[in-house]
Design a protein with these regions (language model features):
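Extracellular jelly-roll beta-sandwich "head" domains, especially the C-terminal globular C1q domain
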Residues: 1-139
Length: 139
């Protein structure tokens, strides 16, 4: 599944990037509601677990009324940011965009569900544009 949000959006501290359009639909083990920041992964498998690769790419900036400094974004599982997926940039001015990318493998136990999202882990609000989230069932 590939979901995107092309338009610039302000993402508040500890909130999720919202995805508005589905470019490529997933299968029955991946679901997303348009306008939501959550993707549900389902452990539909005969094995012990289902494995997914979750990749995010997008452009980040400090809003016009924000304070210039480091900004960051992370992938989150069930609402908890995964530290190893944190992408950090330090713009020199407001509305100066940087491109970031991060990815993770997520194992979902058989017959369970997890949610994944892209979370603003900065100390201030951020701008996100051309957000692209790809979720692939790999095993």
């Amino acid at each position: 599944m590939e979901i995107i949000a092309v338009a610039e959006q302000t993402v508040l501290v500890n909130q999720n990037v919202l995805f508005t359009d589905t470019v490529t639909c997933g299968n029955c083990s991946i679901s997303h509601r348009s306008g939501s920041g959550l993707v549900t992964l389902r452990g539909i498998t005969d094995q012990c677990r289902a494995r997914f690769k979750v990749s995010f790419g997008g452009n980040l900036a400090v809003p016009t009324d924000g304070t210039v400094g480091p900004i960051s974004i992370s992938l989150a599982i069930n609402g908890e940011a995964v530290a190893s997926t944190t992408a950090i940039v330090t713009p020199a001015a407001v509305e100066e965009y940087f491109n970031v990318f991060t990815a993770i493998f997520v194992d979902v136990p058989r017959d369970c569900c997890l949610t994944v999202s892209v979370r603003n882990t900065s100390e201030d609000d951020i701008l996100v544009q051309n957000a692209n989230l790809i979720v692939e069932r790999v095993a």
